[in-house]
Amino acid sequence: FTATTARGDGQGLEKVFEEIVYAKTLPELIEQGYLVRLLGYRIGTSADLSRLSGEGLDFAEEELAEAVDIEERNALVARSIQELARDRRTIAFCVTVNHARHLCIALNALGVPAGLVHGTMKSEDRARALADFREGRTIVLTNVGVLTEGFDDPGVSCVAMARPTRNEGLYAQCVGRGTRLSPGKR
């Protein structure tokens, strides 16, 4: 069972499995009440992605970080999260650890309780950050790839894609973190 048919290596599932026995699309799952309806906002920034090179299915990480991890842009993303998400439990996907840290700082500067998780954290620090988020001590959690797959918190009701991507599979994985059903979710 998989929520997305796209693989990071660009291969389709038919390259891995002999037969796909059952398939449902995201719109079908939403229509049938298995996932919440999505409402998307695009926040325009001054980041110029037109000259970025690609690595496989996505932008080159270092170039992307240079283009988007800018104080002015992070402040705009933080204000947008504050205004649009309000009190919603939000996860924000960032390009690098520094980007996640800078966005977390920008959110906290606005009075939005935010934390961060990334793959190089000590496991006990990551567990504490996740517990703070689940228990409401922080309402925004910035991250770098850690919450993309295998993270299941139905209380997440807002996803902020602070890292542009050309990879549809990655985008679907990230957005999918906010589609789980949960009592009172709006």
Per-segment meaning from a language model:
Residues 63-110:
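Conserved strand-helix element at the start of the C-terminal RecA-like helicase core
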Residues 91, 100-108, 112-149:
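Conserved helicase ATPase core of P-loop NTP-dependent helicases/translocases
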Residues 164-173, 177-186:
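Conserved segment of the helicase C-terminal RecA-like domain
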